Structures are given as C-alpha cells and as structure tokens.
C-alpha cells in the first residue's frame, strides 16, 4: 500500500509526488498483468515470465501436438484396417459359398454343373470387385502403392500388379502395422517357385560399390586406415575412409604404395599395380613381399581380403587377395557374370497368360537390361534378384487357368540362354514334387504278393511303354527315381536298357531324355520302330504317374520316333482367383476329378482368407490399444501442462481484490499528502 515516506523528515513536494506516482503505477501494472491472466486463464503470458516453466511447457506443447497427429493417423489407419476386415469377411463368405457349390457338385449331372459354373463366374466377378475396393488411404490390396488398382483383368486371367509389403505410417508403437495388404494376402499373390538354379557369381569390377560386397569375412566391408610394409621394412598407412567403390580403394592403394616407393627408394609395384581378378583385389609385385595389417580394433584390411592369408603375403606367386564375394545387382555387367562361363546370351521363349514371347537378350549389357527385356511387352512377369543375391528369380503375376501358366524354354539357335541364366522352368534339375502346381507325382510302391508276402514288381509297375513293333517296357518307379527330372530319365533308361538287353534287342531301340529346346520329357525310338507306329503309354495298377508326368497327353513327332510329354512344370499363381477359375472350368467340362481337386484347393484358399482376416484383426486390436495409449498420454501431458501454465483463479481473485484495495489506499494517501495548508504560503 502507498504510504508517506517517513524516512524523510523534510523533503521537497516533488519527491513526495514522484514516490506516490511510482507506488500507484506499480500497483496498476500488477493489476493489469493480473487482469490479462484472468482474461486468458494463463499464469504465464510470455516466456520471460518464467523461463524454466516456459521451457517445460514448450516441450509439452510439442508432445501434445505430436500425439494429436498420431491420433489422426490412427483414425485413418483404423478406417483402412476396418475396410480390410470387412472385405476379407465378404471374401470369406464368397469362398464358403464356392466351396459349398463344389462339394455339392461332385456327384451331380452335367446340366446342373453347367448352371452352377455360372454362379462361380459371378462369384469371380464379385471377388474382382472386392479386390479393387478402396479405403481412405487407397486400394486396400495395393501393397505399398495403394494409388494404383492392384488387380486387372488381362486376357482371361486376373493379374496382380500391386506391390510387395503394405503401406505404413507413423502410428506410435503400431508403426509397423500395414494399412494395406500386398503379396501374400490370399487375393493378391505372385507365383513363388521359379527360383534361379544358376549362381551367376559376379566378378569384382572397379565400379562395384563396397556396399555390394559380402567381404572376405562375409560381414560386409568397412573403410578406414590400414597399414602396409614391403619386405618387412618401414610401415606406412593408407586412409580408405570415404571410399565408395572398389576403384576408389584401388586408386588410394596405388597412390599410397607409389609414395612409399619414393620415400623408401624401393620398387614395389609392376605395371598393373593394383587391379581386380575375378572376385579379389590383385597386386602386381615383380619381386619381394607386400603385407597389409589392420590397426588395433579395425578389420578394414581383413574385410578387403588383404590380410586373411597373412602366412602368404602378396608376391609374384600370390598376387590375389581373398575373394570378396560380390553381390548380384541390377548394375552388374553381363561380362562380369562368371556363372555364364563367358558364353554369350541369345534368346529365350516365354509363355505366360496364354501368350508366347520370344525375347532376345543378346544385346543386354547389364542385369537391368535382362530385367527390362523380360518384363517388357506385357509379359506379366517380374524379374527379381534372389535373397542371397547370387541368382535371378522370375514370378508371374497372372492368376488364370492352366493354359495361362508360365513356362520358359529355349529357342532354336538361342544358345541355351534360359539354362545359362538358370530360369528354364523345366530342366534336368527340376524337382518332380513341383510338377502339377506343387502336387508332384505319385507312384505305386511297396505292394506285396498276398501269398508270399514279398514285394511283387508286377504289382508296383507304374506304366508301360509300347514301342512301334509292339514290344513293351515296364517302368517301376521308386521314391528315389522321382526326385528330379534327371533321376526319372535315368531310371527309365536303366530299366529300358535292362529289358531290351534281356530280350536280345539293341539298347538303341529306345531312350529317354530331357527336351533340348522345348519343355518336355522325350521318349525316342529308332526310325525302324517308328515305321511300325508311334510310342504308346499305358498306366498300370491304377498308377497316376504317367498322367502326372504329362506322358498321357504327350505329342508324337519325328515320323513317330518321338513322344514329348506335356509340360507339367509350368508355374501358376495359387490364389483364390485361380482356384475359382479351376472350379468353373471343371464344372463346365463335367470333370469330376477337376472338381475334387478344385474343392481341395478352395479349402487352402479358405485357410488363407481366415488367416489373413485373423492377422488384420490383430492389427485392429493393436491400433485400438495404441489409440487408448495415446489418449492417456494426451490427458496426462495436458494435466501436467495445466499445472505449469494455467492460472489458479481462486488465488488470482484474492490477489486482485487486495490490489484494488491497495490502489484505493495509495490514491487516498497520495491525495492527503498533497493537500495544501496555510503553512505552504508562509515565507
């Protein structure tokens, strides 16, 4: 409260006036600030009011803003996942209806089957519509590219052009929850079997990135400082920090050793200096020994294959370091692929989605050129680098009938290019378990004579081969015989040779082999036998082996000297679309076995859809949990911020009343102290 300054017994009136004004102004300032606080509800109006509390409030503001953004993201994510769940529920109902129809038609008549096929076709149309539905984020089956329609209809097949993986967003601890589904969702799927069978084994080049090396220790390659010496002399250092390519490493090593030669007055390097040889760094040393060392705690020289063989340093007899195992990349030059053995590439034939493409790879300079050539022209396939980055894989995008399946074969005069690249779909190394969309080949084995209890070869024969003159060769296959195409061909040739020899016939009458150009297993008979008639195949003991090997649907050629099997190693997309198409086709063709097979595969699709929906349900639960967690966090942060920032209205109201009283008292005292009396006019 303003008061008369008792410290001054005698003072000028101006001093009293200024003192009173100062006290009144101070009270007014405090009233003004408190008035602003009451109007805004804030205790801190500017950072300078309390820097410590202001810093804490600023941090809380940022956290609350971030959390609110997360809650918005979670809201969109929940909507997308909810749409996914509903679509998968509809797909489950659809596949249940299809499975019910399939089961009811196993013992039905042709007319009913044909009418039910129309219903299956309508279910396929419904599935096509479901697969292209959108949520707030985009197409739910588009994978990491939801802006593009994931399933397109292409020449009778349903082609998945979506991406691998799902779209993710900042969702707190649920950030790894995909908001869309891509490959592996039971609806969007690619084929998975065509894995390259040849290790292309790229050589080291100057342009090879250090990040594309597995390194001598198979742990990658680090950069840093390494040491070296010549003939046990002075040790010098070379800094490889910042090197990006193998060429960078070679240049720095060359420069360091040349400087070493000048400083030590010695000759270390030959004309080729540092270079690459196959997968290793190579050093041209006419004489003497060059050794490299790692400094303590480092593995740079070891990673580069310069020290792993310390017992034998670099010299004229040991110019190469340890192989650095370069990875296969799209920029790998064709000339660097040791797996090709230096053989030039030619052409391949690719059949997919009921279309045939002859692809010329002779002009390819890099692996990316091969990828572009194979994927161009609407072939409906994707070329991928294998997980171990040593070979290439090819997958088809089109889910259709068997006639739409993928096969890759050679072209006459094409130089066995498909086999060179390891992408021929039917080769000697192809597993018979991969035949018939993965159903494999079944044989009769282990049947015994009911009287003797011994295994009877006659009861285990799978099929007979009838030559042009009527001579019959019995083929009894074992489990070992049906491992690969090569083991099957070897078993047939061995049994045929034995039976021909026992009958006093030349073994040249018959032979089996893998087709050199076209995909198929070939049975050959001599021209003389071909004049008598074509090669015939007859299943025995109800064995399905001949049918599953494609021999029953084989084609004759070469004036009846050749029987080439149907290609049963084609590659298909096994998803709900292909299974429904198979069922529709089987119903239209009155194919009981096909209906049974489609029913079995629909059961697999049911499991996939159920599993996908369960997974999406788990995602939804995680999103709900994260929403609750973030909401709790916002409430807590807002409570803490309120304690730091907001005004205590009760205390502020009391203080406001006190300041009003103080102002009133100050004004009163000032008025009284400034009153004039008679004494003011006495001289």
Question: Residue ranges of each PLM-predicted region?
Answer:
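Short terminal interaction segments
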Residues: 2, 135-195
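Threonine/glycine-rich low-complexity segments that form extended coil/beta-edge repetitive scaffolds
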Residues: 89, 96, 167, 173-251, ...
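Acidic, small/polar residue-enriched beta-strand/turn segments
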Residues: 135, 230-232, 261-353, 386-447, ...
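Amphipathic alpha-helical polymerization modules
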Residues: 1-152, 244, 248, 255-263, ...
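Structured core elements
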Residues: 168-170, 176-178, 282, 382-384, ...
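Extended non-catalytic domains of envelope/secretory-pathway proteins
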Residues: 250-252, 279-280, 300, 369-376, ...
């Amino acid at each position: 409260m303003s008061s008369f300054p008792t410290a001054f017994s005698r003072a000028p009136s101006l001093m009293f006036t200024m003192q009173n004004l100062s006290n009144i102004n101070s009270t007014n300032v405090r009233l003004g600030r408190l008035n602003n606080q009451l109007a805004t509800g804030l205790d801190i109006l500017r950072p300078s009011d309390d820097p410590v509390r202001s810093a804490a409030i600023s941090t809380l503001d940022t956290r609350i803003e971030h959390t609110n953004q997360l809650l918005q993201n979670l809201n969109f994510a929940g909507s997308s996942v909810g749409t996914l769940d509903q679509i998968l529920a509809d797909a489950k109902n659809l596949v249940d209806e299809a499975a019910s129809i399939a089961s009811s038609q196993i013992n039905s008549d042709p007319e009913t089957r044909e009418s039910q096929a129309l219903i299956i076709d309508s279910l396929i149309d419904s599935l096509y519509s479901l697969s292209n539905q959108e949520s707030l984020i985009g197409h739910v089956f588009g994978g990491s590219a939801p802006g593009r329609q994931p399933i397109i209809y292409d020449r009778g097949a349903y082609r998945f052009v979506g991406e691998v993986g799902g779209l993710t967003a900042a969702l707190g601890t649920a950030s790894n929850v995909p908001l869309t589904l891509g490959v592996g969702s039971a609806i969007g799927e690619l084929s998975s079997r065509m894995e390259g069978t040849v290790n292309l084994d790229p050589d080291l080049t100057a342009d090879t990135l250090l990040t594309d090396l597995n390194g001598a220790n198979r742990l990658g390659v680090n950069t840093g400082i390494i040491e070296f010496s010549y003939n046990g002399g002075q040790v010098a250092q070379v800094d490889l920090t910042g090197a990006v390519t193998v060429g960078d490493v070679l240049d720095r090593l060359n420069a360091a050793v040349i400087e070493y030669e000048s400083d030590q007055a010695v000759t270390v390097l030959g004309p080729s200096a540092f270079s690459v040889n196959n997968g290793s760094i190579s050093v041209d040393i006419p004489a003497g020994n060059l050794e490299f060392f790692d400094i303590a705690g480092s593995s740079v020289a070891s990673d580069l294959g310069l020290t792993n063989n310390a017992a034998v340093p670099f010299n004229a007899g040991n110019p190469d370091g340890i192989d650095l195992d370069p990875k296969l990349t799209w920029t790998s030059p064709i000339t660097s692929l040791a797996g090709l053995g230096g053989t030039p590439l030619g052409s391949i034939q690719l059949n997919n989605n009921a279309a045939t493409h002859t692809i010329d790879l002779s002009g390819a300079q890099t692996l990316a050129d091969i990828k572009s050539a194979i994927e161009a022209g609407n072939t409906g396939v994707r070329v991928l680098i294998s997980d171990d980055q040593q070979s290439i894989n090819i997958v088809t995008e089109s889910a259709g009938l068997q006639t739409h399946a993928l096969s890759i074969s050679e072209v006459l005069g094409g130089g066995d290019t498909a086999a060179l690249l390891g992408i021929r779909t039917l080769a000697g190394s192809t597993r018979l378990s991969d035949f018939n969309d993965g159903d494999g080949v079944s044989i009769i084995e282990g049947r015994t004579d009911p009287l003797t209890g011994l295994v009877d070869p006659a009861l285990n024969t799978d099929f007979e081969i009838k030559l042009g003159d009527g001579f019959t060769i019995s083929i009894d296959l074992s489990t070992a015989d049906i491992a690969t195409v090569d083991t099957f061909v070897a078993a047939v040739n061995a049994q045929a040779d034995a039976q021909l020899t026992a009958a006093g016939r030349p073994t040249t009458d018959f032979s089996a082999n893998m087709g050199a150009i076209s995909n198929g297993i070939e049975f050959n008979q001599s021209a003389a036998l071909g004049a008598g008639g074509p090669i015939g195949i007859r299943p025995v003991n109800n064995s399905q082996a001949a049918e599953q090997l494609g021999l029953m649907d084989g084609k004759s050629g070469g004036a009846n000297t050749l029987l080439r099997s149907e290609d049963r190693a084609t590659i298909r997309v096994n998803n709900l679309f292909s299974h429904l198409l198979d069922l529709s086709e089987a119903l239209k063709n009155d194919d009981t076995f096909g209906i049974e097979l489609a029913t079995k595969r629909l059961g697999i699709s049911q499991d996939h859809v159920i599993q996908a929906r369960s997974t999406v349900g788990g995602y939804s639960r995680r999103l709900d949990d994260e929403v609750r967690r973030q909401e709790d966090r916002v409430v807590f942060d807002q409570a803490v911020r309120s304690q730091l920032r907001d005004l205590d209205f009760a205390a502020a109201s009391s203080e406001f009343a006190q300041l009003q009283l103080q102002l009133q008292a100050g004004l009163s005292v000032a008025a009284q102290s400034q009153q004039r009396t008679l004494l003011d006019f006495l001289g």
